[in-house]
UniProtKB/Swiss-Prot annotation:
It is found in: Secreted; Host nucleus. Residues 1-21 form the signal peptide. It comes from the Eukaryota. This is Secreted RxLR effector protein 117. Belongs to the RxLR effector family. Coiled coil: none annotated. Keywords: Host nucleus, Secreted, Signal, Virulence. The RxLR-dEER motif acts to carry the protein into the host cell cytoplasm through binding to cell surface phosphatidylinositol-3-phosphate. Its main location: secreted. One of its GO terms (cellular component) is extracellular region. A motif (RxLR-dEER) lies at residues 48-65.
């Protein structure tokens, strides 16, 4: 720092002398720090140095030389880098041209086709629906139907004490669902053939799994089905604990266990029951035994009312006539009557029409009749009016009047097959309070 101080002082002196020379002034001359005065005794004083600088007398000179050498080296280094800097300056225009040639995002977007808002909304909606679908990795049983969408069997469940306090006894499971009772036998047998012998599902369990696939579409997901299977497994565990508490000896042993031990036992049983339910669910989902027995499942395919009517009519044979002794009923399966007016065809229901008689049998009218004295009890004739299977019979000219003789009770009544075909529906006469009489 001392060398720099001296350099600055010298520069100031030179600058001040130049300024004084320009204005015609002359600076006083100093000699070793003593200014000559008039009539003064001149006495030289010893040289003074800065603090700590009297040991080395040429320290300032050395610092000045070192500063000069540093400046020279910096100047030389800068001069050596000038050619390289010049080359870089010359290359800058070419680099700018290359940058202009490069594609910018704005230019790329301008070349893209325009997409309307409706198309964008449609694409976004489709993407959201696709993300909602859960695609599980295919397992080693991927060759069997939809095994890739099965509920994983390696999941471990754990419930705390608060969750076990919630009872699941309100869940269905003790009996078959009402709408499955007519078909549960065939579906259960088919399900038994598909399952392993160690699973051995019951009819009630088959009905539960069957019903899960008839839930609302928004509820038929793997997550919701998995939670329902967990609740079923929890209910099975709670039913087992209830049986233990009903036995006094087992109840005492169970109460002696700590809460932690009880929790471990319940969770272990929960996973065992859950794995069983998951295996049965996956088998039922892949094979759908309820669809294998679909031809017999009329209630689920046609509705309850239509299925019952179709089943009842299908049980009626083509030839229907039976006889009995006196004071017995004559059961007629099918009959056909034709009137002379545009009344179409009257068809009896498939239920057995029982006509009671004490001494003789009520005459069965099979021919075309227009008048007569014998009256058929209308309360025994159950007509199926209208319905989806009803139809309009074309007009036919009246046929010749004929009446078959009355048959005694001991004689069998036979009906012609050609006139006993089953006819569902028809147009009937409005006046049904009185049957046509026989001439």
């Amino acid at each position: 720092m001392r060398g720099a101080y001296y350099v600055l002082a010298a520069l100031l002196v030179v600058a001040s002398s130049q300024i004084a020379a320009e204005f015609g002034h002359q600076l006083p001359v100093y000699d070793d720090g003593i200014m000559a005065a008039r009539n003064a005794v001149v006495k030289t004083l010893p040289k003074r140095y800065l603090r700590g600088g009297h040991d080395v007398h040429d320290d300032s000179a050395n610092e000045e030389r070192s500063l000069y050498s540093v400046l020279v080296s910096l100047i030389n280094e800068g001069v050596m880098k000038l050619p390289r800097a010049t080359e870089e300056l010359n290359m800058m225009p070419r680099a700018a041209d290359d940058v202009e040639v490069m594609f910018r995002p704005a230019e790329v977007n301008e070349e893209m086709p325009h997409i309307t808002k409706e198309e964008l909304k449609k694409a976004s909606k489709s993407a959201k629906e696709a993300l909602k679908k859960l695609w599980k990795p295919a397992s080693r049983t991927a060759a069997d139907g939809h095994a890739s969408h099965d509920i994983p069997t390696g999941e471990k469940l754990y419930l705390d004490l608060e969750a076990w306090d919630i009872k699941e006894f309100h869940m269905r499971g003790g009996s078959v669902i009402k709408k499955h009772r007519s078909m549960i036998a065939s579906v259960h047998q088919e399900f038994l053939n598909l399952c392993d012998p160690n699973l051995h599902p019951t009819a009630a369990e088959t009905s539960l799994l069957w019903g899960m696939f008839h839930w609302k579409p928004e509820l038929c997901t793997i997550e919701i089905h998995g939670r329902n299977l967990m609740r079923l497994a929890k209910r099975d565990v709670q039913k087992g604990v209830l049986k233990i508490t009903s036995n006094e000896l087992l109840d005492n042993q169970w109460n002696q266990l700590s809460d932690t031990h009880k929790l471990s036992v319940q969770n272990c049983l929960l996973n065992l029951y859950y794995q069983r339910w998951v295996r049965m669910y996956n088998i039922f989902k892949r094979n759908r035994p309820d669809l294998i027995a679909a031809p017999l499942n009329l209630e689920l395919n046609l509705g309850t009312s239509s299925a019952l009517a179709l089943r009842k009519h299908s049980q009626v044979p083509s030839n229907a006539a039976s006889t009995s002794n006196v004071k017995s009923s004559v059961i007629t399966k099918r009959s056909k009557r034709t009137f002379d007016s545009n009344t179409g065809t009257i068809s009896l229901s498939s239920k057995q029409a029982k006509m009671q008689s004490s001494k003789s049998v009520v005459p069965l009218l099979t021919g075309a009749t227009t008048s007569g004295e014998h009256v058929v009890p209308m309360q025994n004739l159950k007509l199926s009016l209208g319905g989806p299977s009803g139809g309009f019979a074309p007009y036919e000219p009246p046929k010749a009047h004929s009446l078959k003789s009355l048959t005694p009770a001991s004689t069998a009544l036979t009906l012609e097959d050609s006139e006993t075909k089953l006819s569902l529906g028809g147009i009937y006469d409005k006046r049904t309070d009185k049957a046509p009489s026989v001439p």
